[in-house]
Amino acid sequence: MTLSAEDRFAISELLARASYAYDQRDLPLLESCLCDDAAISFRVAGGDLVGPFSGREAMMAVYRDAMESQSDVRRHVVSNAMFTPKDAEVDVISNLTLFATKDGSTVLLTVGLYHDTVRLDDGEWRILKRHVELDSAY
């Protein structure tokens, strides 16, 4: 698969849209970023693997549960995306910087990497797999 500049931009926008949707707690927008058979997994500070949680509904349940436990305002900043096309999918590694604001104070919570696999789904790039690798717990 050859990846055009337009595809790279669309995939970068997908990752930004997913972060924005989570931060704004816009569940319909977040869900629209995911393939039906999407999956998510996590590892914090080299610890045990959590997940994968398979299927869009399971992935959305992970997001909803996380949101319910948070009383602050989150800002997920995605940067430095690198793309590796393979067959009908694209692997994307990007940096994650996570900030939180509460009571007028903003703090850096953690940094890490997103390891995403995206694919075209009904003409739109969507997240098929997401592995979140955090450098530290928060």
Question: Which residue ranges define each predicted feature?
Answer:
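Short, low-complexity N-terminal intrinsically disordered segments enriched in polar/charged residues
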Residues: 1-36
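Charge-dense, low-complexity intrinsically disordered segments
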Residues: 5, 50-53, 105
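A solvent-exposed, acidic/Ser-Thr-rich amphipathic alpha-helical stretch
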Residues: 27-95
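A beta-strand edge to alpha-helix "cap/lid" segment located at domain peripheries
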Residues: 68-138
